[in-house]
């Protein structure tokens, strides 16, 4: 396998899972304080990840949960983003103009902001109640937030078992999948 680093992938996934020690206390406190709705903000690929996370949550919850495209939000606004909104976003660069402007706008609307920044941006960090810098695993980070919210609302009762299994097996399962697809990928590339 070209450029495949098994131990690096294992450490990356397990490191992302360990972020729950930062995420969960924050969400527990926000939930106790009360949130009206949950918004996952993104642009391009991060918007696609936001939509996946919202689809997952909608399967379990009656709470208002939505994905917001950063470019649309800075252009047209969204009155649902306000005090009581938990806004979550992920950014690889931390410098995408639409994300920066959208986060500024959400901050001005008094939304509570949780950010995952692969490369920490000091300006964005100032606008967030919690900013976690950890590279890669965007979907996993967003799903950990979603699942914790569902758990706190008593809508995801298997949360503890699920994450106990993820802690034990997810990294190795993802490595196994990647290894098992290598021969398929080689054959596909020849065609």
Segments and roles (model prediction):
Residues 15-34, 176-190:
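A short, well-structured juxtamembrane/interface segment
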Residues 131-144, 175-191:
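Short, intrinsically disordered, charge-balanced linker/junction segments flanking boundaries
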């Amino acid at each position: 396998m070209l450029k495949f680093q098994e131990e690096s992938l294992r450490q990356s996934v397990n490191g992302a899972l360990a972020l729950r020690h930062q995420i969960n206390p924050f969400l527990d406190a926000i939930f106790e304080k009360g949130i009206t709705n949950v918004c996952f903000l993104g642009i391009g690929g991060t918007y696609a990840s936001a939509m996946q996370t919202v689809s997952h949550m909608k399967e379990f919850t009656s709470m208002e949960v939505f994905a917001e495209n950063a470019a649309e939000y800075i252009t047209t606004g969204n009155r649902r983003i306000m005090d009581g909104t938990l806004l979550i976003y992920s950014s690889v660069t931390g410098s995408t103009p639409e994300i920066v402007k959208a986060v500024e706008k959400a901050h001005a609307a008094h939304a509570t902001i949780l950010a995952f920044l692969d490369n920490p941006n000091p300006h964005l960090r100032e606008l967030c109640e919690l900013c976690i810098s950890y590279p890669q695993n965007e979907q996993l980070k967003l799903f950990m937030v979603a699942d914790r919210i569902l758990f706190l609302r008593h809508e995801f009762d298997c949360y503890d078992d699920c994450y106990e299994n993820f802690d034990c097996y997810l990294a190795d399962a993802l490595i196994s999948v990647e290894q098992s697809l290598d021969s398929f990928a080689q054959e596909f590339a020849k065609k």
